[in-house]
């Protein structure tokens, strides 16, 4: 089975799943060679049969098209997998033109699918755009359930989850042992809450500092470690000072050594991501750390589904700092003596669903490569 993967660009975190697909499937890769984004991009030289001749061009406002797509001879493929970018005219063209007068490739979208916050107009546009799609690879069950509510065919909806560099992280995980890294830094045995990622406004990390401040006034003391850097670092430092937490916060900074990141996460007791948790959920659970994030799922990223309340973390009411404080306090009140049990639950969640091997199996099963 010949497969075409056609995307404007690909972030570097997808390296593991794409390399696995490249190894085990007959795939040609098509990306826009000129596409620029603020995130780190994949090194396309890691993939065989990679074509970068397409160019992403602006048509009007946010609307784009892929210059050169018509010359790719996509009719020769059995399956085309693309991103489902509704604001891209080329993807509309692809869904309309494929198969006219020739054998039609099946077209799958690897996409968020549905958020649950769409307006009536957005719903109409999406349904019209999706009507000729043969199948969807969705990041989560939430999106699948939202699409079922909208009347989509269940047989076309396939949950593929997401993944990071699982195999390399697994080797690091096997090396991990408990260490006094936080006791040495803070000089106490208080539980440590970690956040790993960019310190940006959308992460709403000020809520975490305020919540820990509330708990400190009630006699509950916690350490906080921020592993990452970003625009909000100064503001967070000021918030810590205002809440009497200067000595309880460690701004570790950005760390690009995954073994060090693993050690910092493994030895923490809880991750709190008051904004959208996204990839952070997979990262921390890979190394056995549970996570708390908000419960307004239409504003979440798909990885929130790795949080199983009472097992791998918990949720708090979106934007409610008092409820975040309650959630943190409740977690430690009920789980402080079950750290290793929680660690194993986090491992199990990632090992079962959030890894490239799971994703590849979904692709092979859906495409009929394995049964």
Residues covered by each model-derived region:
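A short, histidine- and acid-enriched strand-loop-helix "catalytic/donor-clamping" loop
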Residues: 89, 103-124, 132-135
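Short hydrophobic beta-strand element within catalytic cores of glycosyltransferases
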Residues: 290-299, 314
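Conserved donor-binding/catalytic core segment of Leloir-type glycosyltransferases
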Residues: 183-203, 209-212
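Nucleotide-activated donor-binding/catalytic signature segment of Leloir-type glycosyltransferases, i.e.
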Residues: 227, 234-255
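Acidic donor-binding loop of glycosyltransferase active sites
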Residues: 263-276, 289-290
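Donor nucleotide-sugar binding/catalytic pocket of nucleotide-sugar-dependent glycosyltransferases
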Residues: 131-181, 188
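A charged, aromatic-enriched C-terminal amphipathic alpha-helix characteristic of glycosyltransferases
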Residues: 333-367
């Amino acid at each position: 089975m010949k497969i075409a993967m056609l995307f404007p660009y690909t972030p570097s975190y997808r390296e593991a799943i794409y390399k696995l697909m490249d190894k085990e499937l007959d795939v040609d890769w098509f990306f826009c060679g000129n596409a620029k984004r603020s995130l780190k991009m994949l090194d396309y030289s890691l993939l065989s049969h990679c074509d970068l001749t397409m160019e992403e061009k602006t048509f009007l406002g946010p609307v784009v098209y892929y210059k050169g797509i018509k010359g790719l001879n996509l009719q020769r493929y059995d399956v085309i997998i693309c991103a489902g970018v509704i604001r891209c005219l080329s993807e509309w063209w692809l869904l309309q033109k494929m198969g006219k007068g020739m054998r039609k490739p099946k077209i799958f979208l690897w996409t968020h699918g549905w958020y649950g916050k769409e307006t009536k107009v957005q719903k109409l546009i999406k349904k019209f755009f999706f009507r000729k799609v043969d199948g969807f690879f969705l990041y989560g069950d939430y999106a699948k359930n939202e699409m079922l509510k909208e009347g989509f065919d269940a047989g076309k909806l396939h949950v593929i989850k997401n993944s990071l560099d699982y195999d390399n992280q697994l080797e690091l995980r096997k090396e991990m042992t408990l260490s006094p890294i936080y006791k040495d830094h803070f000089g106490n045995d208080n539980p440590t809450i970690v956040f790993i990622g960019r310190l940006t406004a959308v992460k709403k990390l000020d809520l975490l500092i305020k919540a820990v401040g509330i708990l400190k006034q009630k006699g509950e003391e916690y350490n906080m470690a921020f592993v990452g850097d970003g625009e909000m670092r100064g503001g967070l430092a000021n918030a810590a000072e205002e809440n009497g937490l200067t000595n309880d916060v460690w701004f570790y900074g950005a760390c690009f050594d995954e073994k060090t990141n693993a050690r910092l996460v493994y030895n923490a007791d809880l991750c709190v991501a008051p904004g959208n948790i996204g990839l952070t959920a997979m990262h921390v659970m890979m190394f056995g750390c549970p996570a708390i994030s908000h419960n307004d799922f239409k504003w979440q990223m798909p990885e929130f589904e790795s949080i199983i309340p009472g097992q791998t973390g918990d949720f708090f009411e979106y934007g409610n700092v008092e409820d975040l404080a309650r959630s943190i306090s409740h977690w430690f009140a009920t789980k402080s003596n079950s750290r290793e049990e929680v660690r194993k639950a986090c491992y199990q969640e990632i090992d079962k669903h959030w890894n490239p091997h799971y994703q590849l199996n979904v692709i092979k099963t859906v495409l009929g490569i394995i049964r």
